[in-house]
From Swiss-Prot:
Compartment annotation: Cell inner membrane
Native source organism of the sequence: Sulfurihydrogenibium azorense (strain DSM 15241 / OCM 825 / Az-Fu1)
Cofactor: Zn(2+)
Keyword Metal-binding carried by entry: yes
Gene name linked to the record: dabA
Name assigned to this protein: Probable inorganic carbon transporter subunit DabA
Gene Ontology CC terms: plasma membrane
Recorded family membership: Belongs to the inorganic carbon transporter (TC 9.A.2) DabA family.
Protein's job: Part of an energy-coupled inorganic carbon pump.
Xref: InterPro entries: DabA (IPR018752)
PANTHER family the UniProt entry points to: INORGANIC CARBON TRANSPORTER SUBUNIT DABA-RELATED (PTHR38344:SF1), UPF0753 PROTEIN AQ_863 (PTHR38344)
Database matches in HAMAP family: DabA
Residue numbers binding Zn(2+): 408, 410, 651, 666
Length: 945
């Protein structure tokens, strides 16, 4: 089947989650089976992207002392040995620090120095090595990187590709729309291909389209061509991959799509626009080869121009002269001579060598692959050594803690934890932000599930939020706000009513736009008064009985069937609905007319079974709750000496006019706030029946209180405070004051890194200011994970750069706890780290560019301007400040406090984490306090630091 080639081509795509549940991910996830360095080499070629920062960036860090000289020299020595280069490591270091960052200028200076003489053998060697002696190879290498429409545009200054691209984006964005536009694409419910086919009046299947494209254009490899096609639509394709691989995603159920159909539609559109707009005589790859053979120098020069290889002087000549042979030869001779002179200069003045070929090969190897990898490894090694020496120190705390506080591992919790520990004697813990409760929660006023767990998992339990107070006032206010919002959105998304919108509702737009930009604090207070206050609620965490499951499922489907017929304008009696439901459940025949309605609304036996299963999964049995509680407490080493108050503090963020708000929430909660998870775990841990069955003794007087850390403002709010007994209220108020002090200290600390923030109030104002592009730094500057006891880092100032997960290896007899940490929180941290890395090194390719040009599209993501690929990474403002990187792009460094043998044994019993460590996507450091030694995994072995 022809679609197999498309399926294989799409295998390099990652998944991209929608903005509403933004999940940090590695854009090179499908290359993680390769070593980090090899994967980056492939990605550089495949995506035409940068995969490291420029050498000058690393040299700047070296000059600031962040890269240790001994680490750099050790890695230079290793590099020289592995590549059989006989050079002095100190002289190579001089080249890396003093010459390489300005290599282009060094070549120009050398070229203009008449005293430098170059032997002919060096010129010939460079010419051959760069492929300038074999134009055919150059041509074949380059054309594989382009679509046929792009080649026609490059060679003949046409605009076919842009027209094709914009049309494809227009269609796919409308098909994938999740409620942004008020003018929906017809036939979406029939699936992508049927919708596309009817829209473009086609009577063909994907197989036919692929075969037609192949016959028309004769590409050298259909699979390679399709891969380039998916890369041009990288964001859209990655979102489709998420859609087709996510069971029961509502929009995928309603409007199904797959990558093979999408790829086929792109082949069709490109074919159509080439036929319509191509003014050249080149109709296929056969014609292209013939044209190349007759116009070799012209073709190569045009490709050089497009790839920014040709210098401005020769670009000008390309358009003012047709002597392409002469232009090409002059250009490459100049390039070769400047390179050769620089090599001779370098050999003589820096390396004291007359073996120019060896110097050339050294520089070539460094410049092509090794230089920046050597820098990044040296930077990581420096951090590993510096922090390893910090964490190996032992600190003893004898005073009884005032309270325990458990936070998410998120880097933004580090400063708050540190400041709380210094305000008074608090013992803090870190755990993945779902707090041991993976659940799908249905809020009392919502009709959909929130998946509150890491993105790589699907929760098998459903929890319902149920109000304990009357909700009439809340519902009344909420309906008013929703109605107003719908009116405004309807006007905004209808292209023919902007005038009406301004005339009728200009005052309201003005209130929001100017108020939230010029007077954000005032507007926030008004909004707070208008916004309905939700009623008190509790969670239905106890499992439903079989009878309740039957009843609720039948009621659900009764309503669904009744509403389906009502929408179709068909009157149906109660007894008929019950009869249809009975037949549906028992797989009996239903009349054809009724069946048509059921099919249209996807009311099937399969869906009934799914809903029945979801109702069956509501809540946990008592034994399941005991297991959740036991696992949670042992995971973080909280097994004894419980104080009266144990605070479980999740985190979320609040910012206005920010499409990426979900990215600032909790990654372990699927891009949602951790509020629900901490409440659920507190309810479980406070249950008398649960405590009675635990093997860990929790005193009767110990209370678990849920809280939420707003990472944008560092304010902490607590919930369910009615659990606090009257005789403990004074102590509780004191604890809340301590948290407030810690939050204030954290805000002041963050001021120094936030641009244009002069006082702590500015931090709060940023969260409600519509014009603020950087409400907080989020997870930028993340560096590593520390897995161990809080005592080991209690005197360290980690500046919100570490994910902190509590772990006590002494209670982890069978390594099960460490394996859970490696398989869960470590992987989440690696996804976050990788996304920040690639969004920094090439923000246009792997990030999402500047927020200034962002437009939300289809409510699933953003694109730049009116048409672009769906942007899959982080905005420029998240990782850069004033044209300088704020985030330091390095691999995640995982520090694990445990005996070396224990870590090796646990890691070897995992699959993906072990692969990431072996392939050095994660740098693993072991803090072995029993040996009083620190070990780093490097090049397949643990080495002592």
């Amino acid at each position: 089947m022809k679609t197999v080639a498309l399926k294989e081509a799409s295998s390099i795509l990652p998944k991209y989650w929608p903005l509403t549940m933004f999940v940090h991910h590695n854009p090179l996830h499908e290359l993680e089976s390769l070593h980090f360095k090899q994967a980056l080499k492939i990605a550089k070629d495949l995506f035409d992207a940068k995969v490291y920062m420029d050498p000058s960036y690393y040299v700047d860090l070296y000059r600031k002392g962040k890269v240790r000289k001994d680490s750099l020299e050790k890695n230079i020595e290793e590099f020289l040995r592995e590549n059989n280069f006989n050079f002095n490591k100190y002289k190579v270091r001089k080249f890396l620090t003093d010459i390489s960052p300005s290599w282009k200028e060094y070549k120009e200076e050398s070229f203009n120095n008449p005293s430098i003489k170059v032997p002919d053998y060096l010129l010939e060697y460079i010419k051959k090595d760069k492929g300038y002696d074999n134009l055919d190879n150059l041509f074949y290498t380059y054309i594989k990187k382009y679509l046929f429409s792009e080649i026609l545009d490059i060679l003949f200054d046409q605009n076919i590709y842009n027209v094709f691209f914009n049309d494809a984006v227009e269609f796919i964005s409308r098909f994938l729309d999740e409620g942004q536009t008020s003018i929906t694409l017809p036939f979406r419910e029939q699936g992508y291909w049927n919708c596309f086919r009817q829209f473009y009046k086609l009577d063909k299947h994907p197989e036919d389209i692929i075969e037609e494209f192949e016959n028309t254009f004769q590409p050298p490899s259909l699979q390679d061509y399709a891969r380039q096609l998916y890369i041009r639509f990288f964001g859209w394709s990655s979102f489709i991959k998420f859609r087709e691989s996510t069971p029961f995603y509502p929009y995928q159920e309603e409007f199904p799509i797959n990558l093979e159909d999408f790829g086929s539609s792109l082949l069709y559109l490109e074919n159509q626009y080439i036929q319509e707009l191509n003014k050249s005589k080149i109709k296929n790859y056969f014609d292209l080869m013939a044209f190349y053979k007759e116009n070799k120098y012209y073709v190569i020069l045009k490709l050089f121009e497009h790839r920014k290889i040709l210098t401005p002087k020769y670009i000008s000549k390309l358009y003012t002269s047709k002597d392409y042979d002469n232009i090409f030869n002059k250009f490459i001779n100049e390039e070769i001579e400047s390179e050769a002179k620089a090599i001779v200069n370098l050999s003589t003045k820096v390396f004291d060598k007359s073996d120019y070929l060896q110097t050339y090969n050294l520089v070539k190897t460094l410049k092509e692959d090794e230089e920046c990898y050597l820098w990044i490894k040296s930077l990581e090694d420096s951090y590993a050594l510096n922090f390893g020496r910090e964490f190996i120190k032992e600190y003893q705390i004898d005073e009884k803690p005032k309270a325990f506080a458990v936070f998410c591992v998120d880097v933004r919790s580090e400063a708050l934890r540190r400041n709380l520990e210094r305000v008074d004697n608090y013992k803090t813990f870190g755990v993945a932000g779902f707090f041991g409760v993976k659940m799908a929660l249905i809020e009392f006023d919502k009709a959909h599930e929130l998946l509150l767990c890491p993105a790589m998992e699907i929760p098998d339990k459903v929890v319902l939020e149920v109000p304990t107070q009357k909700t009439q006032d809340y519902e009344k206010r909420k309906k008013l706000l929703i109605s107003l919002k719908k009116i405004l959105e309807g006007l905004k998304n209808n292209p023919y009513t902007p005038f009406f919108a301004v005339e009728s509702f200009g005052w309201l737009f003005g209130y929001k736009l100017f108020g939230k930009t010029l007077f954000p604090s005032v507007v926030a207070k008004i909004d707070k008064k208008i916004k309905p206050k939700p009623p008190k609620t509790f969670y239905m965490i106890d499992k439903l009985s079989e009878k309740e499951v039957d009843t609720y499922t039948d009621k659900f489907f009764y309503e669904k069937i009744y509403q389906a017929f009502e929408k179709e304008g068909i009157k149906i009696k109660d007894c008929e609905v019950k009869d249809i439901l009975s037949k549906l459940k028992n797989n009996e025949n239903i009349s054809q007319n009724y069946q048509k309605v059921l099919n249209r609304y996807r009311i099937t036996k399969q869906y009934y079974d799914y809903i029945y299963n979801r109702f069956s999964n509501i809540g946990y049995t008592l034994d399941e709750q005991v297991i959740l509680a036991e696992n949670f407490l042992r995971l973080i080493g909280m097994v004894e000496d419980f104080p009266e108050f144990v605070l479980l503090v999740g985190h979320g963020s609040v910012s206005d006019n920010n499409p990426y708000e979900s990215a600032l929430d909790c990654g372990a909660c699927g891009g949602n706030s951790g509020y629900h998870n901490v409440r659920a775990m507190c309810m479980i841990l406070n249950k008398k029946e649960v405590r009675e069955k635990l093997s860990i003794r929790i005193p009767d007087g110990t209370i678990f209180i849920p809280g939420l850390h707003n990472t944008t403002t560092d304010e902490i709010e607590f919930y369910d405070e009615d659990l606090v007994p009257e005789n403990s209220l004074d102590k509780w108020e004191e604890i809340k004051k301590d948290f407030k002090k810690a939050g204030e200290k954290t805000r002041i600390e963050r001021l120094s890194s936030l641009p244009y923030a002069d006082n702590p109030e500015d931090v709060i104002v940023r969260s409600i200011d519509w014009s603020e592009m950087r409400p907080e730094w989020g997870l930028s500057k993340n560096l590593g994970v520390f897995v161990g006891k809080s005592e080991s880092r209690i005197n360290s100032v980690l500046k919100n750069r570490f994910f902190l997960h509590s772990y006590d290896y002494k209670i982890d007899v069978d390594n099960s706890i460490l394996k859970r940490i490696l398989n869960g929180p470590l992987l989440i941290a690696q996804w976050i780290n990788a996304e920040h890395y690639f969004s920094t090194v090439d923000n246009e390719k792997f990030g999402s560019g500047s927020k200034v040009y962002h437009n939300v599209v289809s409510r699933i993501g953003v694109f730049s301007g009116n048409y672009s690929d769906l942007k899959i990474g982080l905005p420029y403002q998240t990782v850069y400040v004033e044209d300088r990187p704020f985030h330091e792009p390095i691999r995640l460094i995982a520090f694990v406090e445990a005996p070396l043998e224990k870590v090796v044994e646990a890691a070897s019993q995992t699959d993906h984490p072990m692969m990431l460590v072996k392939n050095e996507w994660i740098r693993l450091v072991v803090i072995d306090k029993e040996k009083n030694k620190v070990f780093l995994f490097s090049n397949g072995n643990f080495v002592e630091l």
